[in-house]
């Protein structure tokens, strides 16, 4: 007698619809992971679109014949100073030696690229403290950011007050390019300072990030924290300000219709001067500084609410 034959079981079948959904879900998950990775990479590296620091300091004030002292301050948790810079005293008998200029350089290079500007300030006759932000020159290695630059500028003010014993009402903060935007923020936050000098502030410096083609693929406005809101800082300014603007003729340049009007909205007593680009300090540059410093006590009084 033959044993009963077992029924052949049918192999399981997979629904085509289910398979399509599984493949779609896998593709969506992969796309989401790729997009999140892109967001992370943009968040991590976008600072390089705005800041262009270099480490090697090629020049010092000695190259311009200036006496100076190397300085280091803002001690970190490891006990080492985070910031390096130069103290350049005014020449003996200089007209404005009672004033000290805290110089904030721009977003590119390092302190070694500012020797010509510092030499021009020395001709004006003021004391100068210039330093590199973290991530620049010989200062502590770090990615620059608006918050870091702001903290470093505050540390420089503390150094002037605590180590150099400089009175706040004799400190003028000068900034160039992005440094001018930083000087605006510092000036708005410290009404006890003598004033600010703004050399070609940037109307919207962070636009370089938002105009980059890669920013269209990610929520750049949520990923970028830096703003450098010049208009907001200008409105809050309550101390005297000198605005140095460049034009090829040295004459005022007509403002664009979309100009945010940083100067127009600035508070406090203000003075604006248009200068031709020059490799050496022009007489117009020196005259602008002299006029502004001569009138600074009166301007300070006029700026008080």
Summary of predicted features, one role per range:
Residues 31-75:
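An N-terminal hydrophobic leader/cap segment in hydrolases
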Residues 197-207, 226-229:
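Active-site nucleophile loop of the alpha/beta-hydrolase fold
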Residues 175-185:
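Glycine-rich nucleophile elbow surrounding the catalytic serine of serine-hydrolase chemistry
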Residues 165-177:
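Alpha/beta-hydrolase fold nucleophile elbow
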